[in-house]
Amino acid sequence: MDTLSKAYKLLSLIAISGECSKDVYPFLYLTDSYNEKLMTRLKSDGLIKIHYKDKLRGIRLTRRGKDLLLSLSPERFSNNLTDNSETNRPRSDLPRRLRLQQASIAYAMLQCAGIPVYPEDKPALFSGNPQDSAKFALPLFYTAREWKELGAETIKINNSRSLGILLCEDALYVLYFTGDHPIKWEYRTELRLKAFLNYHLKQDIFAGLCQKNTDYPIKAIFLGSPMDSARILMESNGGFQKSYFYLDGSFDFMHFLPVSMEGITLLKLLCSPALQSTLNTLLLSDLEPVNPDLGLIHDTIKGTTPVLLSYNFDMLRLSRFKTALSFHEITGHLICFDFQKDTLQSYFGDLATIETIDLAKFERRFFH
């Protein structure tokens, strides 16, 4: 099998996920007609099977499919397709299957954004050897399974809802998948995860990739669909006993990305501090400096109106801006991408006016 083919890419994604969702197809650039032919061929070759239970349909590898991948690239698949790993022997209960499928979507989005997810494309997480990292460039993604290789040290964070961590030049992002509703959330567990990552960053967990003892902010990214799920998250109160997500401040930054090609563009932007700086400079060029006397968070002033750059969709920052506007009984102004406008308008109502960045024009200028 050609390791550059779309068939191999799909099989690889199933292998590292355990069970794949059909929602990954757009990120693999599979059209409906091509996808139907591809699935038929892979099933007839005995490489995949469809697992259907509890009204959830997923794609799994057959024994033959696993053997093929192990023969083609043992260094890529041995950890996922051997022993009793969850990806090699996925369970049938609905919550676990949903988590595997959510992981498959997240991995597909990361790959679509050009971010490595396979072990041979990145240094070992706890190697401690800068030479191992010399040939790799950021950003890099590590799954939750990879950090759990520390064993007993990670017992207290085993219940974290995180799918993994994304290391960029200026920050470390903890990745979550929320879907169309608030995910289950245990504040103390996620705080322990943040403390765990902060400790190991300072101990040079990523030898050669980032400078030891540098203060890298640890932020969160939430993947959800549709875009309006962000409003649901920002308005969530955590439910009974605070067992579901709400803006609890466990992270200082909580970004929302839609599960879509628009989300891919936003992911690339978050991973590029240079591009964010360029965009900020363009957006702020005709506006006035921050006014500290206003007593609320803002990035610039338009006339007498506080303006917030909202394109990175930091839910915590947006929530604080809304609260401050309401408290001071003033109107604010938001600058966001066009695909984010409806959600922000619904969330802010009359408290803010909105100016949009044309996503298509942005992509043509910076990504083509």
What is each PLM-predicted segment?
Residues 87-186:
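Exposed, interaction-prone assembly regions rather than primary DNA-binding/catalytic cores
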Residues 100-106, 185-206, 236-238, 314-323:
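Well-ordered, non-membrane alpha-helical segments in soluble/globular domains
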Residues 175-183, 213, 217-368:
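Long, compositionally biased intrinsically disordered regions
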Residues 63-76, 80-83, 91-112, 117-120, ...:
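General detector of folded, globular domains
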Residues 50-55, 167-169, 300-302:
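Short, ordered beta-strand-loop transition motifs
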Residues 85-88, 115-129, 206-228:
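Short glycine-rich, low-complexity/disordered patches
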Residues 1-83:
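Basic, Lys/Arg-rich alpha-helical nucleic-acid-recognition elements, primarily the DNA-binding modules
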Residues 46-50, 116-120, 278-287:
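Short secondary-structure junctions
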